[in-house]
Every structure is written in structure tokens, then in C-alpha cells.
């Protein structure tokens, strides 16, 4: 790629302003990157410059980073981002592209790829596939959690930090290396009276109104007909072998590998090895042909 410095991006989709970062030449292999819960596009700041030959566009999902928050009556269900993702790739002129997602972004990537398989050439999932399914009889309990959380979080003020270092320390408490925490925090903060506060929408911390059932999860996995690479963190979801086993049961063209590191392994010291594995997969070295 031409350099490590990203190019800021902005789009207007469905009345929402969406922000992002891009790396590489526009003529490169198109690769859309979706970050995890409470992260932002800077999640790919270390990985993207190492993906040789790719044009990487990392999106701040709604309510994260520099993208707009949704209106008070709206929600942050995992499928709510799909129309905006479709709008962004259409604005980019990408009829076919590859998709990489981390954590919540991996889950959203699975949903998008299963819904629009004709658009996704190859799929890369970093330490997540789909959310844990719930039994149908749990629907009333889940809906109650959603309604009460929404009422509570609409009235909640974001935490204020006196300094950038204070915000970085707060993210470090969640197990992130300091250098990675700083990258994410710098894009997730704005100035306010008394210092700095998050740009992330507090409602992202609330319960989902509806969760997928076992059969719905299975239908999503079966619809992932493109070559798919699942990289699991040894200190993350790699400790739950049933996640990969379930994916292997239903995704036909799946490659699963375990990666040394924690849940944010793509932001840790082994990022070069991760980039090498993803580059090889995008170049078709997994033996699976694209449809």
C-alpha cells in the first residue's frame, strides 16, 4: 500500500452522516472493514496499511467514532446498519468487494454477506461469527430488557474525562494494549465542559430488542456461500471451540485458524502475521473459488 496514513471519508446515507478512513489506491482490491462494539474505524489503523494491493475502507458504524448517532426513536440492533453499509458500498461504486469484520463488526458482516451474497466476494471474520442464540420463549424477557434499557440510557450523560490519558486508561481497563487504546480513544472523543467525553452513543450499551434463534443463526451461516476465513483469538473466542465448530457445520467454504493474542489481536504485536494470512486468503490461497 502507498502508506500508513489514512484518508478521511464522509458519506450521506439515509439522512445520516457516516465517517470512515481509507488506505491504499482506489484501483486496489476493494475491502470494506467493520469495527467492533464501542470501537471505530481506527481499529484497522495497524492492519490496513499491511494489506498489500487492497483499497481498504473502514467505516465508523452509526453511533461510533465520527459517524452520526441515530435519532431518539431509532435502535442499534445488529441489522440496523445494513442499509447504511449498502449505501456506502454503492456510493463507492463497489459492485463486488470483500468484507472484514471484528467482533460486533464480524457479526454485522455475516448478516450483510448472507443477505447480499452476490455482492461479497470473500468474507473475513475476526474473533466472532454470530451472537449467541436465544430460545424463543425468552422473547418477552428480552423485550423488557430492551425497553427499560432504552428509557434509562436516553437519560444518561456520557462520562467526562479531564484528560485524553484518563480516557485511554479507561479503555485499557477492558484489556486493550495502551497503544491500541489510544488509537481508538482519539477517534471516539470530543471536547466538552470539563474536558473530554465519548462520541459513542450510550444506547449502544443497551439490550437488543430481539435476538436470533438457533434456526435463524443456522440460516445465516448456510447463506454464506462465499469463501470465508474465521480467525479466532487464543485469548478470546478461541477459548470457546463450539463457536468455530458451529460455523464449520454450516459454512461450506470455511477456513478456521487460531491466532496468538487477545480479542483485539489485529491491533497487537502480531498484526503483521494477521495481515499476511488475510492477504493470502484474499489472493485465493485457501483453495476455495469465488462464485
Predicted regions located by residue number:
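Gly/Ala-rich beta-loop-alpha elbow adjacent to hydrolase catalytic centers
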Residues: 101, 105, 109
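Conserved alpha/beta-hydrolase catalytic His-Asp/Glu region
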Residues: 156-211
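Conserved serine/cysteine hydrolase catalytic core
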Residues: 192-249
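Alpha/beta-hydrolase fold catalytic core
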Residues: 1-31, 52-54, 94-95, 130, ...
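Flexible "cap/lid" loop of the alpha/beta hydrolase fold
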Residues: 114, 121-160
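Catalytic histidine-centered segment of alpha/beta-hydrolase-like enzymes
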Residues: 262-271
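Active-site loop/oxyanion-hole signature of alpha/beta-hydrolase fold enzymes
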Residues: 11-16, 57-100, 116, 276
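Conserved HGGG/HGGXW glycine-rich cap/lid loop of the alpha/beta-hydrolase fold
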Residues: 21-69
Amino acid at each position: 500500500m502507498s502508506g500508513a496514513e489514512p484518508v478521511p471519508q464522509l458519506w450521506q446515507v439515509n439522512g445520516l452522516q457516516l465517517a470512515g478512513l481509507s488506505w491504499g489506491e482506489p484501483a486496489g482490491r476493494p475491502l470494506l472493514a467493520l469495527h467492533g462494539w464501542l470501537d471505530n474505524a481506527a481499529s484497522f489503523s495497524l492492519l490496513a496499511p499491511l494489506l498489500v494491493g487492497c483499497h481498504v475502507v473502514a467505516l465508523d458504524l452509526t453511533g461510533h467514532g465520527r459517524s452520526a448517532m441515530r435519532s431518539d426513536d431509532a435502535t442499534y440492533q445488529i441489522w440496523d446498519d445494513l442499509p447504511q453499509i449498502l449505501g456506502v458500498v454503492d456510493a463507492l461504486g463497489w459492485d463486488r468487494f470483500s468484507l472484514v469484520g471484528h467482533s460486533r463488526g464480524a457479526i454485522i458482516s455475516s448478516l450483510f454477506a448472507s443477505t447480499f451474497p452476490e455482492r461479497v466476494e470473500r468474507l473475513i471474520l475476526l474473533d466472532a461469527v454470530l451472537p449467541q442464540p436465544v430460545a424463543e420463549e425468552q422473547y418477552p424477557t428480552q423485550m423488557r430488557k430492551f425497553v427499560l434499557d432504552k428509557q434509562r440510557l436516553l437519560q444518561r450523560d456520557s462520562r467526562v474525562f479531564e484528560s485524553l490519558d484518563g480516557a485511554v486508561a479507561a479503555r485499557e481497563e477492558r484489556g486493550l494494549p495502551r497503544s491500541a487504546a489510544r488509537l481508538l480513544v482519539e477517534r471516539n472523543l470530543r471536547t466538552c465542559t470539563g474536558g473530554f467525553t465519548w462520541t459513542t452513543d450510550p444506547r449502544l450499551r443497551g439490550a437488543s430488542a430481539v435476538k436470533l434463534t438457533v434456526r435463524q443463526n443456522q440460516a445465516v451461516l448456510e447463506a454464506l456461500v462465499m469463501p470465508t476465513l474465521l480467525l479466532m483469538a487464543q485469548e478470546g473466542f478461541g477459548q470457546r471451540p463450539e463457536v468455530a465448530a458451529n460455523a464449520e457445520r454450516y459454512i461450506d467454504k470455511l477456513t478456521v485458524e487460531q491466532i496468538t493474542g487477545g480479542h483485539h489481536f489485529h491491533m497487537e504485536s502480531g498484526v503483521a502475521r494477521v495481515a499476511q494470512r488475510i492477504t493470502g486468503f484474499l489472493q485465493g490461497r485457501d483453495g476455495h473459488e469465488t462464485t
